[in-house]
């Protein structure tokens, strides 16, 4: 009997801060009063030290909850906002996750359906056997101030682990079309998307192209629209999902919430994010139909299984939504996105050059937060060194790798530094002790003044350490985030 192919696990990540759309409208109403119609709810916004890579790492960690990472055989990262044009972005994610060196990694880009297209390819490869494949999608798009999309977009990431075995959702098949329909585009030199007229996009693209693909796809898959229990349309434009459901004969109740009011449209990540959201509440035996749109259409059909109940708890979409903090500081967000040039002072002029030689030698220490544990005494330390720091046994060559990224820690000391430069002053940092041993002088992120205190439990998150603006190079490291 052939093993079933499908989704083995899923996860998600949404940034903590939620910019109120009313704040965006209030700042731009003098120039663009028409934004009032979009000024309800909130959208996710990444912190200054987040990008598609850091968000993908967090979504991957969530996806791999309870999974032996050594079993992962391939990794793909889909996004149209990857920070490096000629450096494997998925390779950085691989290092942060401490996946085996023998894993294959791939960046997928160029279209808003890059996430679903990468997922289809991974599922087809998995059907032929082999190790599970980790599919990640993340997006952090810039939007021109006072534009509609400034309120519509959101930042986020999602992950799916696919392979053979006992999937939580069996893959039943897919259908795809490719058409150079330009609803929007962004050239290599542009910071912002150029978007075409909304009604034409809705009528010709959403209702026309997706509608036709749904009809053909359902027929090719041998499924009636009425049999679909969860219908995922990753578009937040009002009425589009309902219209497509009616056109395909799918019950209106099957339409999955596109998270427009609380998240926004997270681009390439949105189909996978909504799929993760649907799986969080799905029951066994439900048929889930997923749409991807961008210069064509992807249609994917899944059927959930009883394995859903066996998944260990995870943050997921629901947990990410629950940790949100309302934010109405529009100017700060513009500054973090590089759209507002503030006087930063001489301390911001320090050269942040990263020697590639040093990063290569210490990639596990820096990107993977891998410390060392003495095999004779059990003493844990960070960083790992040739000589153990054990009090009574300074053994040489006795340490083994000891990953610390998923180990909780406790704040021992801290300071709020208003002199050093940081895009979110003051700069919080201090000493933390990991459970079971190991101490690190860490920066704190996603914190307010009341969040940092001695004895507070923290976890670690992969973030941007600094940006070498002279060479346009991003340095990554791990930062502490309060738990609870």
Place the predicted regions along the sequence by residue.
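Condensing-enzyme catalytic core mediating Claisen C-C bond formation in acyl metabolism
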Residues: 1-52, 147-204, 208, 283, ...
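Phosphate/pyrophosphate-binding loops at sites that engage ATP/ADP/AMP, CoA/4′-phosphopantetheine
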Residues: 59-73, 211-229, 248
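Short, acidic/hydrophobic/Gly-rich beta-strand patch recurrent on exposed beta strands
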Residues: 429-435, 443, 479-480
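Short nucleic-acid-contacting surface segments enriched for D/E, G, S/T with interspersed K/R
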Residues: 446-460
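OB-fold/S1-family single-stranded nucleic acid-binding modules
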Residues: 461-484
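Claisen-condensing/thiolase-fold acyl-transfer catalytic domains that form or cleave C-C bonds
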Residues: 57, 81-82, 100-102, 107-130, ...
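Cys/His-rich short segments
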Residues: 348-410
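Short aromatic-glycine-enriched beta-strand elements
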Residues: 419-431, 475
């Amino acid at each position: 009997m052939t093993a079933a192919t499908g989704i083995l696990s899923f996860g998600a990540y949404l940034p903590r801060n939620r910019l109120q759309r009313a704040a965006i409208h209030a700042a731009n109403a003098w120039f663009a009063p028409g934004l009032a119609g979009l000024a309800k709810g909130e959208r996710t916004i990444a912190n200054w030290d987040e990008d598609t890579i850091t968000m993908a790492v967090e979504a991957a960690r969530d996806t791999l909850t309870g999974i032996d990472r050594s079993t992962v055989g391939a990794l793909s990262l889909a996004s149209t906002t990857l920070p490096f044009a000629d450096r494997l972005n998925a390779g950085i994610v691989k290092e942060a996750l401490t996946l085996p060196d023998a894993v294959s990694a791939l960046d997928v880009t160029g279209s808003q359906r890059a996430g679903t297209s990468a997922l289809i390819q991974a599922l087809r490869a998995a059907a032929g056997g082999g190790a599970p494949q980790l599919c990640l999608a993340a997006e952090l798009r810039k939007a021109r101030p006072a534009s509609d999309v400034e309120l519509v977009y959101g930042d986020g990431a999602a992950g799916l682990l696919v392979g053979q075995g006992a999937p939580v959702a069996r893959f039943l098949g897919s259908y795809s079309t490719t058409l150079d329909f330009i609803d929007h585009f962004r050239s290599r030199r542009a910071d912002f998307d150029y978007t075409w007229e909304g009604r034409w996009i809705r009528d010709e693209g959403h209702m026309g192209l997706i509608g036709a693909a749904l009809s053909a796809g359902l027929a090719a898959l041998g499924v009636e629209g009425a049999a679909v229990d969860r219908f995922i349309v990753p578009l937040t434009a009002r009425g589009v999902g309902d219209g497509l459901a009616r056109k395909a004969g799918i019950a209106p109740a099957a339409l999955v919430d596109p998270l427009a009011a609380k998240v926004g449209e997270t681009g390439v990540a949105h189909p996978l994010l909504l799929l993760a959201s649907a799986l969080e509440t799905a029951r066994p035996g439900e048929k889930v139909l997923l749409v991807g749109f961008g210069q064509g259409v992807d249609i994917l059909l899944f059927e959930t299984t009883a394995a859903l109940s066996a998944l260990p708890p995870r943050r997921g979409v629901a947990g990410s939504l629950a940790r949100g903090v309302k934010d109405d500081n529009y100017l700060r967000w513009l500054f973090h996105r590089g759209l507002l040039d503030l006087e930063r002072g001489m301390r911001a002029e320090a050269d942040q050059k990263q020697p590639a030689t040093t990063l290569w030698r210490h990639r596990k220490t820096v990107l993977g937060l891998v410390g060392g544990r003495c095999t004779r005494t059990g003493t844990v330390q960070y960083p790992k060194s040739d000589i153990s720091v054990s009090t009574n046994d300074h053994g040489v060559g006795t340490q083994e790798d000891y990953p610390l990224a998923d180990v909780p820690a406790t704040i021992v000391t801290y300071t709020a530094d208003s002199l050093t430069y940081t895009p979110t002053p003051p700069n919080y940092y201090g000493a933390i002790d990991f459970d079971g041993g190991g101490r690190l002088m860490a920066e704190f992120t996603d914190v307010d003044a009341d969040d940092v205190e001695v004895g507070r439990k923290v976890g670690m998150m992969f973030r941007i350490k600094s940006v070498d603006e002279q060479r346009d190079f991003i340095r990554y490291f791990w930062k502490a985030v309060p738990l609870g």
